[in-house]
Amino acid sequence: AEACLDTGMRCVLVSGLNNFSSSPKQVEEEFLKWNKKNSLISYQLGFHAEYTCSKELLWKVSEMAHHYRTPVYAHISETEKEVEECKARYGMTPPMFLDSLGMFDYGGGGFHCVHVTDQDLDVFRRHRMYVITNPGSNTKLASGIAPIADYVRHKIPVAIGTDGPASNNCLDMFREMFLVTGLSKLLEKDAASMDAME
C-alpha cells in the first residue's frame, strides 16, 4: 500500500482472514486505518475461504460487513472437493451457505467461482457480486474452468486476477486475459462464445 501511495497508484487491499492467521479485531483495525489514510487506498473485508474459517469466524465477518455496510470478498467454489465438503458440512454450496449468513448483503466478490450451480448464480446476481476469475491458477492446480460465458449471460460482472505466486507461475495479466477467453471457448465448445470486446 505504501508503494502505491508513493507512485500514485490506486490500491484495494483485501483481508485474507482464516482460522490460522490474524483476527477479526485486527481486520477491523486495518479496515479503519487504511480507509481513512488516502483516497487512493481502500481496504475491503474478506476472508480466505469457507473451508479455512469456522462458522463463528464467518459470522464475525458478516457482522462487521453489516456494521460498516461494506462488501466482502473470498475464494469461493474453486474446487469440486471444496464444494462437496461444504455441502457435507452445511447442506449447501459455498455461495448458498455464505448467503445464509448474510455475508454478501452489501455486495462483494468471489475469487475463482469454478464449480457453481444455477442457485449460486442467483446469489451472485442478487447481491451484485463480482466474479474474479483466475484462469492461470485454476489451470496450474487443475481446479477446472470457470463458466465465464454463464456469468456474462447472467450479467454477472467478471474481473480477472492472478491469484498469487504460490498458485500461479506467471502473474502476467495479458496471459490471464488470453486464458479467460481461450478456456471459456474450450468449455463452451464454441470459438465464437466470447468476442474480443468481452
Q: What is each PLM-predicted segment?
A:
Residues 110, 115-118, 139-145, 170:
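C-terminal active-site-proximal or functional interface alpha/beta core segments in diverse enzymes
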